[in-house]
């Protein structure tokens, strides 16, 4: 970026311990999590405020970041800070059970909800792309998507390979903040993986954090390693420096047959996130400033080639699926008429979980102490004693996942269990078992908090894929319930014009008041997911609503 206000050569690290720098834990928590989003161990490009996902930023510019920090340190417990696309625009009197921060990022009136108009606004300093958890201050590094990716690979193994992916291998691309979870998720599921990435710096980061095991010198070397490890039944992840739009067609040409194919490049943002075939990264970034339309066209043409290769694999009978980056849409716009012949991962593998309100529940230890996370891991096992799959996940996470920034954990649980765990964590803070408060949040990719016809709400039973009332209702309900901060975003995951979604974070500070808020929010939030899927006619969701006592007037009334 050429705007000096969007670049600062500084390293940010959230405070640790139990000493406040703000007036209460309800304002200290968003302050620390904002700073944690920009920790160099966490963010992809923190000096430009970019957390992950192409240009997903934590604040609009450095002046806005400074003012957010300053405002949070003085904010009272009966005040609410309003943040508009990464800019702090107002502080208003509310009450002690209201959110301390309300955030709206990247939202545009539908007719203007496209990258061209957004980029004009961004260039003028009038907007910011918040992705999902970048601008809502609850990104925890690649761990945040590891379990969801793991669950996807495990379910694919159940559906296609008799219950296991051992001795199988996954072909994919993208090792950014989200895609970087793929190699570790495949390894944890028991599969090998070949992970193509066009930036060596991202490969180095994933090697350093142990998300990927090793790097091949070239494609031939990668294929030799894959053949060896699958023959030995070993689950080892391999990174390959290169361009997916060049390598996938070459694999098709050679007759190489993976066992599973997906992709998690930043295809949602052709101007900033997808390197055209034959280009260097330096060419791409330079021309994005001077010839944006040509860059977008070249990137989308390469995506069309990439998707055609994925379709070729699918024709061979290889399980092939989109992992939520909107690459099928981009390819379709470039003339690949049947780009949507392979499904998205949600309708293919994840929707039954969403029907029960199960999704990416996460928490972070504001103390900075890893031991606080290990104690909460043990509490989860204690309170959910009979879920062997969940216990195995927690054991693998402790063994294999390196914390990035403040220690955190991701754990997919649903309606009923989220509130149970939240109340237990709050009690652990009250008793002193945890050395400081924890925050509980989630990805916007959850059962009731997103409308995204090419991802989370693809192929809904009743055809309501594009109805975006649901994330709005989710945000309103979480605000009414007393979440500590609530966010409403547009364009996350799949890009401008293709999604609306909401997020929430709540603080466990050990008080009675926190317990009341936790009980409300962590019941209502997944409850909206069950409601949304029950309304669409899913029997699993209807049964869950009845079992959990949800009051759905048109269904349970």
Curated annotation (Swiss-Prot):
Pathway: Amino-acid degradation; L-histidine degradation into L-glutamate; N-formimidoyl-L-glutamate from L-histidine: step 2/3. Keywords: Cytoplasm, Histidine metabolism, Lyase, NAD. It catalyses: 4-imidazolone-5-propanoate = trans-urocanate + H2O. InterPro entries: Urocanase (IPR055351), Urocanase-like (IPR023637), Urocanase_C (IPR035401), Urocanase_central_sf (IPR038364), Urocanase_CS (IPR023636), Urocanase_N (IPR035400), Urocanase_Rossmann-like (IPR035085), Urocanase_sf (IPR036190). GO terms for cellular component: cytoplasm. Coiled coil: none annotated. Transmembrane segments: none annotated. GO terms for biological process: L-histidine catabolic process to glutamate and formamide; L-histidine catabolic process to glutamate and formate. Its cofactor is NAD(+). NAD(+) binds at residues 53-54, 131, 177-179, 197-202, 243-244, 264-268, 274-275, 323-324, 455-456, 493. Its main location: cytoplasm. It is found in: Cytoplasm. The active site is at 411. Binds 1 NAD(+) per subunit. The keyword Calcium does not apply. Its EC number is 4.2.1.49. GO terms for molecular function: urocanate hydratase activity. Belongs to the urocanase family. Homodimer. Catalyzes the conversion of urocanate to 4-imidazolone-5-propionate. This is Urocanate hydratase. It comes from Pseudomonas putida. The gene is hutU.
């Amino acid at each position: 970026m050429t705007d000096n206000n969007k670049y600062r050569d500084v390293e940010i690290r959230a405070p640790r311990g139990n000493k406040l720098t703000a007036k209460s834990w309800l304002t200290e928590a968003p302050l620390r999590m904002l700073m944690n989003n920009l920790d160099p161990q966490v963010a992809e490009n923190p000096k430009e405020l970019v957390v992950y996902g192409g240009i997903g930023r934590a604040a609009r510019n450095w002046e806005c970041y400074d003012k957010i920090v300053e405002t949070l340190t003085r904010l009272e417990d009966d005040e609410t800070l309003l943040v508009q696309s990464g800019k702090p625009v107002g502080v208003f009197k509310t009450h002690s059970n209201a959110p301390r921060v309300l955030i709206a990022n990247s939202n545009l009136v539908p007719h203007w909800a496209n990258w061209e108009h957004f980029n004009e606004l961004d260039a003028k300093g009038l907007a910011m792309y918040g992705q999902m958890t970048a601008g809502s201050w609850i990104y925890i590094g690649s761990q945040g998507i590891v379990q969801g990716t793991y669950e996807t690979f495990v379910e694919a193994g159940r559906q296609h390979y008799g219950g296991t992916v051992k001795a199988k291998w996954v072909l994919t691309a993208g090792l950014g903040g989200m895609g970087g979870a793929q190699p570790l998720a495949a390894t944890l599921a028991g599969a090998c993986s070949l992970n193509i990435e066009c930036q060596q710096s991202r490969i180095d980061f994933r090697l350093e954090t142990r998300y990927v095991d090793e790097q091949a010198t070239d494609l031939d070397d990668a294929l030799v390693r894959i053949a060896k490890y699958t023959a030995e039944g070993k689950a080892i992840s391999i990174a390959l420096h290169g361009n997916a739009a060049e390598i996938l067609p070459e694999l098709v040409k050679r007759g190489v047959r993976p066992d599973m194919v997906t992709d998690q490049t930043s295809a949602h943002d052709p101007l900033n996130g997808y390197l055209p075939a034959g280009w260097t990264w330096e060419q791409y970034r330079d021309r994005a400033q001077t010839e944006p339309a040509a860059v977008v066209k070249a990137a989308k043409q390469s995506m069309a080639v990439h998707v055609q290769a994925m379709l070729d694999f699918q024709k061979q009978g290889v399980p092939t699926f989109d992992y939520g980056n909107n690459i099928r849409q981009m390819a379709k716009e470039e003339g690949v008429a049947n780009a949507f012949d392979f499904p998205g991962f949600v309708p293919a593998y994840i929707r039954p979980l969403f029907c029960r309100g199960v999704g990416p529940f996460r928490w972070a230890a504001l103390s900075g102490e890893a031991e606080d996370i290990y104690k909460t891991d043990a509490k989860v096992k204690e309170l959910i004693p009979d879920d062997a799959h969940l216990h195995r996940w927690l054991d693998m996470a402790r063994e294999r996942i390196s914390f990035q920034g403040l220690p955190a954990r991701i754990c997919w649980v649903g309606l009923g269990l989220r509130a149970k765990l939240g109340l237990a964590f709050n009690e652990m803070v009250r008793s002193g078992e945890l050395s400081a408060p924890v925050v509980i949040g989630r990805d916007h990719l959850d059962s009731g908090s997103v409308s995204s016809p090419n991802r989370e709400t693809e192929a809904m039973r009743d055809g309501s894929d594009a109805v975006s009332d649901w994330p709005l209702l989710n945000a309103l309900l979480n605000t009414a319930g007393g979440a500590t901060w609530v966010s409403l975003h547009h364009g996350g995951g799949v890009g401008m014009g293709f999604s609306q979604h909401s997020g929430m974070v709540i603080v466990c500070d050990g008080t009675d008041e926190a317990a009341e808020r936790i009980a409300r929010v962590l019941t209502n939030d997944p409850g909206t997911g069950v409601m949304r899927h029950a309304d669409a006619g899913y029997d699993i969701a209807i049964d869950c609503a009845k079992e959990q006592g949800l009051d759905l007037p048109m269904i349970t009334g």
